[in-house]
Amino acid sequence: MTNTETAVFGMGCFWSAEELFRKINGVISTEVGFMGGNIKNPTYGQVCRGRSGHIEVVNIIYNPKILKYDDLLELFWNNHDPTTPNRQGWDVGEQYSSHIFYFTEEQKLLAEKSFEKIQKNSELKIVTAIRKASDFFPAEEYHQKYFMKKNNCILNF
């Protein structure tokens, strides 16, 4: 596929993150999985037990002619709490920490600029990590498009 770019964010439970991004015009596909850990092909169980060092992430393939990386960053910042280490709501553990994984120097610079803007406007310390993307490991199939499959679930973004 040509003319696409990839963005990866960790912002708590990957089910909610995927549901948010998959509906955005310009997003071609989303997939949930794990990034940033120290073992190959981790299972959900290994990640949840804190044995792998991975973060739950949403992998987003998008068309940069329709959707800008800055727009994705804005959705990232506005739809989770970047001030709580290793936690999002009721979900607690390092796998739920706030992360931006970048693929290019441009993404890194845009992420850092957005981080500074958010920090400037926040009374609390922003704990989001900005890290170079590493291997992405897809989560098990039952995690993919979870809320879409469970069409009786209601999410408010």
From Swiss-Prot:
Signal peptide: none annotated. GO terms for molecular function: L-methionine-(S)-S-oxide reductase activity; peptide-methionine (S)-S-oxide reductase activity. It is an enzyme of class 1 (oxidoreductase). One of its GO terms (cellular component) is cytoplasm. Gene3D superfamilies: Peptide methionine sulphoxide reductase MsrA. It catalyses: L-methionyl-[protein] + [thioredoxin]-disulfide + H2O = L-methionyl-(S)-S-oxide-[protein] + [thioredoxin]-dithiol; [thioredoxin]-disulfide + L-methionine + H2O = L-methionine (S)-S-oxide + [thioredoxin]-dithiol. One of its GO terms (biological process) is protein modification process. Keywords: Oxidoreductase. It comes from the Archaea. Its EC number is 1.8.4.11. The active site is at residue 13. Belongs to the MsrA Met sulfoxide reductase family. Has an important function as a repair enzyme for proteins that have been inactivated by oxidation. Catalyzes the reversible oxidation-reduction of methionine sulfoxide in proteins to methionine. This is Peptide methionine sulfoxide reductase MsrA. It comes from Methanococcus maripaludis (strain C6 / ATCC BAA-1332). The gene is msrA.
